[in-house]
């Protein structure tokens, strides 16, 4: 069963528009920054071990979710087809 800190990090990062800095996560969760870093590392490793379609990445001094690189062709197809569908509907 996932610890509340793990679930909270997931929930916050999921809704964030930009990478979330560990210091902000620590403040929101009322945990030391070191513990937040551990939680993020544990989450990233568990997603990789479970061969998930997404990753928790450290970028621009913060954390964000991103699709797994080996699924780029599917994501690209979704983005391109989604764009043409939206354009066709608007016309």
Residue ranges: model-predicted function:
Residues 1, 71-83:
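Short, Lys/Arg-enriched N-terminal segment that forms or immediately precedes the first helix
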Residues 20, 31, 85-87:
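Alpha-helical hairpin
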Residues 5-10, 88-91:
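Short, leucine-enriched amphipathic alpha-helices that occur as contiguous helical runs
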Residues 15-21:
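Short capping segments at the starts of secondary-structure elements
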Residues 43-72:
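Charged low-complexity interaction tracts in eukaryotic proteins
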Residues 32-42:
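Short amphipathic alpha-helical interaction segments
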Residues 22-28:
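A short acidic, leucine-rich amphipathic alpha-helix
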Residues 12-13, 25:
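Hydrophobic structural patches
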């Amino acid at each position: 069963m996932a610890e509340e800190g793990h679930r909270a990090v997931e929930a916050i990062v999921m809704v964030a528009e930009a990478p979330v800095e560990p210091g902000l996560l620590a403040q929101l969760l009322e945990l030391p920054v070191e513990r937040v870093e551990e939680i993020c590392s544990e989450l990233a490793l568990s997603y990789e071990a479970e061969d998930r379609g997404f990753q928790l990445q450290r970028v621009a001094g913060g954390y964000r979710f991103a699709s797994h690189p080996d699924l780029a062709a599917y994501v690209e197809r979704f983005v391109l087809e989604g764009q043409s569908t939206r354009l066709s509907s608007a016309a």
